[in-house]
Amino acid sequence: MPPSGLRLLPLLLPLLWLLVLTPGRPAAGLSTCKTIDMELVKRKRIEAIRGQILSKLRLASPPSQGDVPPGPLPEAVLALYNSTRDRVAGESVEPEPEPEADYYAKEVTRVLMVESGNQIYDKFKGTPHSLYMLFNTSELREAVPEPVLLSRAELRLLRLKLKVEQHVELYQKYSNDSWRYLSNRLLAPSDSPEWLSFDVTGVVRQWLTRREAIEGFRLSAHCSCDSKDNTLHVEINGFNSGRRGDLATIHGMNRPFLLLMATPLERAQHLHSSRHRRALDTNYCFSSTEKNCCVRQLYIDFRKDLGWKWIHEPKGYHANFCLGPCPYIWSLDTQYSKVLALYNQHNPGASAAPCCVPQALEPLPIVYYVGRKPKVEQLSNMIVRSCKCS
């Protein structure tokens, strides 16, 4: 039996003759020679935003402003809006992972907390309002050699039975034995065990860049000013079990752990090259003359562009949009473009080349009136912060 390549040769000959005899010209279905009308693109983006805002607020049309009281917004409403805006701004400062790393499959690793009986916990004993979870960073670095490879990190805790409702807070071990607040959780009474999960991606990235041998978390009872009982009533698997033998081993395997999702180094070697692509975010795109896929600036003035007076804060915002060609391995000025043209002809519903689309989006807080009542809302995914080819 002839090799498979020889069996396919009769099928490939007509296509090869087509490539030789057809004059060299770009594939008609893939031409990008048309001039982009930027004003038309912006108008379409503005109209899309009009519908997006109304849809997110579940409004069929802009609300009437006939009953809106004159004068400035109430101080309490303005304070709520400002705090929401500041929180969103603070969250956007967090570094984004490399866009290229998102493409690769992620390897999942579990790193167990150092056993609670270890002597490194001695200085934390005698604190009934807190539990301490320490991790050996050498195990973290073995699983994730470089911070850029980390996609996500979760702290997982197995909560056992809880008789009373309790508000708990999670802290990160910081410099000089201080503790930095991370998040909180309200735990309801339950007769069955439950896994708790906290996103600690940013924290673990920090640990990977530092050289501390031991890092950790603290789970504490919420300290309320009007409560005299600050005891942590939550029982977490892996602490003071009192078990021996096989039961102790099983109990220890379910002690708190970090679940790490990271790109294996061998799958992402190009991330460490000095030639790796820049993140297509506002920091790069707004300060360059990039012609390919990038974030393009677009400021929406609610009154001027949408004819709206019902949104009282902000007066407008930078919506931005993604635009630009995505470089493709089969260039249009090569003979391979004819193969792509045939592919397009037989697969009209498929995309032969990647498109420039949003990657990171930010929310937009607004203040508007419903009748005489002011409302503060946060609209998700309203600001394009970075783009990618997909």
UniProtKB/Swiss-Prot annotation:
The organism is: Sus scrofa
Q: Which InterPro entries match?
A: Cystine-knot_cytokine, TGF-b_C, TGF-b_propeptide, TGF-beta, TGF-beta-rel, TGFb1, TGFb_CS
Q: Where are the glycosylation sites? A: N82, N136, N176
Q: How is it modified after translation?
A: Transforming growth factor beta-1 proprotein: The precursor proprotein is cleaved in the Golgi apparatus by FURIN to form Transforming growth factor beta-1 (TGF-beta-1) and Latency-associated peptide (LAP) chains, which remain non-covalently linked, rendering TGF-beta-1 inactive.
Q: Map out region (Straightjacket domain) in residue numbers.
A: 30-74
Gene Ontology biological process terms, A to Z: adaptive immune response based on somatic recombination of immune receptors built from immunoglobulin superfamily domains; aortic valve morphogenesis; ATP biosynthetic process; branch elongation involved in mammary gland duct branching; bronchiole development; canonical Wnt signaling pathway; cell morphogenesis; cell-cell junction organization
This chain is encoded by the gene named TGFB1
* Primary role: Transforming growth factor beta-1 proprotein: Precursor of the Latency-associated peptide (LAP) and Transforming growth factor beta-1 (TGF-beta-1) chains, which constitute the regulatory and active subunit of TGF-beta-1, respectively.
Q: What is the name of the protein in this document?
A: Transforming growth factor beta-1 proprotein
Q: Does the keyword Magnesium apply?
A: no
